[in-house]
Structure formats: C-alpha cells, structure tokens
Amino acid sequence: MTELLSPAGGREALVAAVQNGADAVYMGFGSFNARRSARNFSDEEFLAAVRYCHLRGVKVYLTLNTLVTDRELPALAETARRASEYGVDAILVQDWGVYETLRAVIPDVPLHASTQMALHTLSGVEEAARLGMTRAVLARELSGGELREIAERAPIEIETFAHGALCMCYSGMCEMSAVIGGRSGNRGACAQPCRLRYGWHGKADANPLSLKDANLAAYAGEMAEMGVACLKLEGRMKRPEYVAAVTGIYAALLREHRAPTADEQKKLALAFSRDGFTDGYYRGRRGKEMFGVRPETARWPEEWFGTLRAAYEKEDMRLVPVRFRAALRLGEPMVLTAEDGDGHCVTVTGAAPEAARSRAVTAGEVEARLRKTGGTAFTVSDCAVTAENGLSVPASALNALRRDALAALETLRTEIPERREGTFVPAERIKNPTEPPRFTASIYRAGQLTDALVNEGVETVYVPLELLPSVEVEKYRGRTKFAAVLPRVWRTADEEGLREQLRTAKERGVECAVLGNLGHFALVRGLDMELRGDFGLNVFNSAALRFLKEQGLSGATLSFELRHEQLRDISKCIPCEAIVYGRLPLMITENCIVANEFGCRHFKGRCDAACADSACAAAPELTDRVGERFPVLHAYGCRSELQNGKTLWLADKPEYRKIGLTYARLRFTTESAEECVRVLRAYKGREEYTPKDITRGLFYRGVE
C-alpha cells in the first residue's frame, strides 16, 4: 500500500499526524534541515518520538537535507549517529558531502534523495539507486504522465508531494532568498521573497512568483496505482491541527480507495489555501491560474481545529490490534501469547491458578479481564481462552499477565536494530594552488562569443548545449576550449536527443561537458568527455568535492553562497572554479514567467523553439517593491531563469585570486558583445571599467 508521509514540526504535530493515519513522519533533529525555524526535537524528544511512532507502526524519517560547511560536518555526523542509535528509519539528504559522511558513519541507515536534489528524470533516479539510495523524492513540477513513466521504471522507491506549498523555483535550485537577504533556502532559512509583490514596467502590483498550494487529493488513488511508494504532505511550518486535518483526509482516501468528497475538498481549503488550490503541474497545464496568495483576511478555523485537537490530545485513535491466546491449568503457570499484525509474537507466564473453593472463574471472565487494555497503545482484536474447570485466579494476576505480555510486545515493536557505526574522517587537507585563476566565460547568446573576447584570453567558453549549433566552434578551435553546459532542467523524454547533441558537439571539437544535476551523469556516460561540475551541484564542502572526484569529475564550480574564507578553506582535491562576475541566477521555473504575463505563441505546454521572436528574447525585467529590476531569461524547454538585478563584480577585489581557485568564471547573460570584452579586460587589469549596479554578492557576507 502507498505510504502516507506527514510533517512533524513538533511533538504536537507528530501526535496529530500519527493519530490521524500517517504511515510515516518526517522531522528535524538539530539544526541541519530544510526548515530550521520549525520546532525541531531535542535528543530526549527525538528518542521518545521514535518510540511513540514505532510502537504504533509508523516510520520516522530524519531531514538532514541542507548544505553544510566543512566546520559543520563533524556536528552533522554526530547528529546522524545519534539518530541511528535512536532507531530512525531513513535520512533525507541533499548535500553530496553529507551523503559521503553518512555512508561512512552510519552505513546501514537508508538514505533518501531529498527533493532538494532536484531529481526530475528517470536517469536521476537511476543514478540515486546506483549510489545506494533507497528512495527518491521527485520534483513537484512533474506531470502525472511523467511521474508514471518514472515510477513504473524506477529501481528504487518513488516519493512525491501530494499536498501543500509549491515553490516557484525547482527545489534545491533557488538562490533568491540567499542572494537578496542572505537567508539560504538550501540551508533551511528561506525568507520566501517569492510571496512578495512584483510586476512589470517598473510596477510591483501583482504576485507572479506566488503559486497556490498543490492539492492532488483527487489523484491519490491514481498515483498509488502507478506505483508511487509514498505520498508526501508538506507542512512542517503549519499548525498541528492542519496536519491532523490533511493527514486524516488523505489517509481515508488511500485506505478506502476512493476520490475525495466535496466536503473533504472544502475542509482541505478551510485548513489552509492560497486563494484556492492548483493541480496544474500534475495535469500538465501551466499558467496564470496556478498562482495565488493567502488573503490578509484569512483566519484559522479555530472551532473545527479545536475539535481536531481535542480528538488527538485526549484519545488514542491509533491502537495496535493484538491477538491473545491464553491457557489456564491447575497448578501450572498461566500462559499468554500475544501477537500483532506485523509478525511480532511474545509468550509470557504468570501465577499458577488454584482450585476454586467457592465460585470458579469462567473463560469469559478471563477474556474480559485480558481485554482491558486502556491506557496502552493496544486493543485486543481476538482473544481465545482455554481454561480448565474449577479454577480460581485473582484479577490482579490476570492484570499482571496482560501487562507483561503487552510490555514484552511493546519492547519488540520499539526495538532498535543493530547497526554498524563508522568514524567521521575529515577530508585530507590539500594545499591551495598559489597561481592566480585562469578565466572562463559562460555565454547566453552566440553573439557574445567574438574574436575580441577570445583574443583577450579565455581558457574555456561555456555554451548551453542547445546554443552550440549557433556557435562557430570550428573557427575558435585551438584558441580556446569549449564546454557544453547541460540544461539545468529537462525531461526523461528529452534524453536521447540530448545525448545525440552531445555526440555531435564532441565531433565538432567540444571537449568538455558541464554537469549540474545527478541525472547528467547518466547522460554523459560513455562519451569520453572531460567532465566539470556546475554551480547546480551545490558544492559546499570538501567531502562533496571528494565525492565528485570519485564520480569522474575533473573540476567543479563551488557554491556562490560561500564566503571567500570558506571558498579558501575547502580542500581542493580537483581544480575548483567560482563565479566572480555576472548576474547570479535566482530561480529556474517550470512556469514561464514571461508567457504568464505577455503570452507566447510557442507556449503549448512545452516548447522546442528558441523563443527568438517572443517576448523573452528581450530579457524583460521583473520589478520588486523597491524598484529593483530582475531580468528574466529563456531557459531550455520554455522555462524561465530569473537573474539578480545587480551584477556581481569582484575585479577590484584581490581576494578571489588568493583562495586557491584554478578557474574564475565570468557569467555573461544580458551583456552585449562589447561589454563582455570590456569585463574580461577589466578583470585582467587591461582597462578601467566598472558596470552599473554592481554587488559583491555573497562573497563577503555569506548566508545563514
């Protein structure tokens, strides 16, 4: 049966989830999770929570799905070790350094690929399986058909979000909160700037980045039928009563194999919505109708929530059925066998019955006494008593027999498995290169690559794979290297075409492929190209670099969320690169921001055109409340990539030359060909030039 996974942002929410039918809960422990402001659990609370859940047949998943620095890794390893010791069933991860660490420290604990890994293709899931992960949480942006295609062919379990908040950006790829305010969504501190007002033509008069919550209740049965192993409910930041309401409805739908009633849909909306719900991604219908905000007048339904709260606080609705078999014989210890539905079975003995001097106990009276399980997590579903005639048994002896049996059964159900433990070993310290970095350049338009740029000296030119047919690779061979940048987001159906494009690129002299997602490793396998990691791999620590080296990468771009000291201190087992110039990418979105506002004649659910004659060719600018303008660029598959309004500029800052980088990347997006050359000349100290509206990015301030 498909598992229902509910959020547990605190003890009360955990009880609400379990009592209303959750098969599993996900929760935080310590500070390393994607909802740091949720009420996470202390050691004592976490152990008690695991026991509470396991007693009732509910699994517990720990969220360690954030990016972690080298200094934080030892504490994370210890957190994971204690969670394993307390019996956690699986751990969700995003950071490849965390993955490496957990495989070494707690090798027997199952790992799940978090949605923060941005897995959205069969190839990505297959790569997660190759690495030993047992489950992949897919991106929310997939359609029902795409979900089915993956679920039916996946070698590991598939989990998908069924209800709750939708981020505008693909999870794990959003930098908006980090770049604008220093609060990283990749470290559990997202400030949700996407919920604010933005607009066009200099006005912030709408909410074009605020999606309604997803509601896939109508498709719960369909997803179960297609082989989805787990339906996940979002909401670790929401009230426990919300968790109770949504869990209860989805549990009933899965248990009873039916569609939601109109009343249930009304209750889901009453619990929480942003001006209604959306199923747009699941149905493959992107567009403006998917967007909404929570009205300022919205209030929690306190009366209904009070009823829900009273139910899960005062009554254990999640009792474990047990079968009793009792045998009473004169002069022999009483025997009681208790068995649950999960294969646990115990047998206990009690005081020996004596011959009755007056009234003898009956089998029915023994059964009635054994069925009194109040105050426990058990209920007797069946009780068979075999008793000789003429016996006397004190009620206290029967009570003790029942208590002993249930205590023994509880011990079995909450038993913590024996697991191996390893030792955390920090990455080997490798001395930083002392030479200044060589410059690479990524381009967005073919016209940005010119003789003048190449003549100034660019070690490698990064070109989007889909742009390569328009680039004169042959003209510049021998004067610079070319690297094909794979799309940040694609679909399983695109993969053969992408492989063919890579083969063609290699034949033309493109030597290198740039990977930004786990699924890319499958796309390039067997092509014998040099492989470099892009910023999308979110390299935040030395262990992540070590992992990427083991996967065959010859270089990697470090996360631009890192401060220069953190960039310096990473142990560079392979050549490292950092973005030192350009508009930093804030979001990549499945919904085309431009098409939603201006329309697009190519926009028919998906688009193979380059959008050269559409609105997004001009890089329209989204405006925020303070007048900052954010260019929106076209991305592969008719998606949008939102850029920062200010340009990262470090040409006048010598620190980036002294932190062990092999390459320094100039990221060109909206620049003219002439501007590209001037930027490169400025970074090489050959021209006095500074663009307008610059920022130092996160190079000095870093992120929370």
Give residue spans per PLM region.
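Glycine-rich, highly charged phosphate/nucleotide-binding loops
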Residues: 41-46
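Short glycine-enriched, charge-decorated loop/helix-capping segments at active-site entrances
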Residues: 34-40
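Conserved phosphate-binding/catalytic loop of the ribokinase/pfkB sugar-kinase fold
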Residues: 117-121
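Surface-exposed amphipathic alpha-helical tracts and adjacent flexible/coil segments at the periphery
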Residues: 1-20, 24-34, 47-50, 56-84, ...
